[in-house]
Regions:
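Non-catalytic accessory regions of SAM-dependent methyltransferases
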Residues: 52-169
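Non-catalytic substrate-recognition/targeting regions of SAM-dependent transferases
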Residues: 157-162, 166-168, 184-254, 262
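Conserved class I S-adenosyl-L-methionine
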Residues: 270-277
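Conserved SAM-binding loop of SAM-dependent methyltransferases across substrates and taxa
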Residues: 280-292
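Conserved SAM-binding motif I beta-strand of class I
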Residues: 294-299
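S-adenosyl-L-methionine
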Residues: 306-341
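Mobile active-site "lid"/loop adjacent to the S-adenosyl-L-methionine
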Residues: 342-372
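C-terminal catalytic and target-recognition region of SAM-dependent MTase-like enzymes
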Residues: 368, 382-444
Length: 444
């Protein structure tokens, strides 16, 4: 009996030891797992601290306009109170208001008058390659929703929250402009995004624009893909147009007027039409396509007139529309003196100024050409006129047309007043996103 009790006792002790040992091993496993989690959290926290430490800050003055708080992405140098030491041109930085509140993240160029351009108002978003790929994908989603698929401005700078970035889509070909240092540094990301989303036939860089020099950048142009023939043909409103991506104005073609060119279809039928500042003849060829009796387009550039004639032949309209090389200001004045008349006058001049110092000259120029245009019209004729000068507001443009009508002793009735096509979206509060004014008036 005594032996049995001892045996039972030893058995219980052995079982207890096994249970205790297993518990210690399980506890050790849990401790090791917890240690691993803690180590990962510490590593992530350490990386976050490094990231935040590296993220330089810009502090704004306490008394500044509400423009930035209301959504404008530009911050001028005279609005800045302090910039952290060690900031380099092109760096991504955080911006804080004078009261300490977070304003946004963007890129900085201390040498520029516009010292910061904001990319996001969300502090949690990291500005990296994927950020821009996602943004461009969102831009494409918007264009598809609004019906701009074949040809469109895929990215319109500030309006698409990527300041100073322009990407135009011409069917399977793309043209990129990066007009500020901070956005130019991300050019490889834009090329990657286009390749991922579209599988394009070609990508071309048109950075041959003087504004880049204000950012310390050189003017340049060239292929961002395998080389291809930069002379392409696009379709617009049932017509075909040659586009020279390498040497054409801006990015090769004025996509912002594509809706406005369609707007003339009812007023040009059976009409004698004169177009000034014709460039490659897009408005004039639309007029011929929509049933005009005769169309004459004039432009000072011989190269533009040559392309316009090619476009007329491309669409089989060379017997209706013709083009001449001439100075529009001189010809309009002479024709009004000669009392030449037509049914429709179309004016699509380039920007007359990019500086507030010369805005009065621009006003005088717009008034002059519209006055002369009105004098060419038969009673009941139509004036089709545009301004792409961003410093001329829609209100000012209408005032100029009213002054021209008064001096021409004509009565006008508004038919259409609109802006650029919707692939160039307008953001309220960011005035430079609305730059194009397009007006049709009946003239008596």
């Amino acid at each position: 009996m005594t032996f049995k009790k001892v045996k039972d006792t030893r058995h219980k002790e052995q079982v207890a030891e096994k249970v205790k040992g297993k518990g210690q091993r399980d506890q050790g496993t849990r401790i090791n797992a917890q240690d691993s989690v803690h180590a990962c959290l510490i590593s992530l926290l350490f990386l976050l601290v490094i990231y935040l430490a590296d993220m330089k800050r810009v502090y704004l003055k306490k008394k500044i306009a509400n423009r930035i708080a209301n959504g404008h992405p530009w911050i001028f140098a005279n609005e800045v109170q302090k910039v952290d030491d060690g900031v380099n041109a092109g760096d991504i930085i955080e911006v804080y208001f004078g009261n300490g509140k977070f304003a946004g993240k963007g890129y900085i160029n201390p040498k520029s008058q516009i010292i910061v351009r904001l990319l996001t108002r969300n502090k949690e978003i990291e500005i990296n390659e994927q950020f821009f790929i996602d943004r461009i994908a969102e831009c494409w989603k918007y264009r598809k929703k609004t019906g701009y698929i074949e040809n469109c401005r895929l990215v319109f700078g500030e309006a698409d929250e990527m300041p100073q970035l322009i990407i135009d889509k011409f069917n399977d070909y793309f043209v990129i402009q990066t007009l500020a240092l901070g956005i130019d540094l991300w050019k490889p990301a834009f090329v990657k995004a286009i390749n991922q989303i579209f599988k394009p036939k070609g990508i071309y860089e048109r950075n041959d624009v003087p504004v880049r020099e204000l950012e310390g950048l050189s003017q340049q142009k060239g292929f961002l893909s395998e080389p291809f023939d930069t002379r392409i043909i696009i379709n617009e409103n049932g017509l075909k147009f040659n586009v020279d991506l390498e040497n054409g104005q801006k990015t090769g073609y004025f996509l912002d007027q594509q809706d406005n060119r369609r707007a003339i279809q009812n007023i040009v039928k059976d009409a004698d039409v004169i177009g000034a500042f014709t460039y490659t003849g897009t408005f004039e060829i639309h007029a011929a396509h929509y049933g005009a009796r005769s169309v004459l387009g004039i432009d000072i550039s011989e190269n533009a007139i040559e392309q316009a004639n090619q476009n007329a032949k491309l669409n089989g309209l060379q017997n209706i529309v013709r083009f001449e090389t001439a100075n529009a200001f001189d010809v309009l004045k002479q024709w009004s003196r000669d009392r030449r008349q037509c049914d429709v006058v179309m004016l699509d001049p380039p920007a007359f100024t990019k500086s507030r110092e010369t805005i009065q000259k621009a006003i005088t120029g717009y008034k002059e050409i519209n006055l002369r245009g009105m004098k060419l019209l038969r009673p009941g004729g139509f004036l089709v006129t545009s301004s792409c000068t961003s410093l001329v507001s829609p209100e000012l443009f209408l005032q100029i047309i009213d002054m021209a009508a008064k001096d021409a002793r004509r009565k006008i009735r508004q038919v259409v007043f609109q802006t650029q096509s919707s692939d160039h979206p307008i953001i309220r509060g960011i005035e430079n996103t609305q730059y194009l004014k397009f007006l049709i008036v009946e003239v008596q």
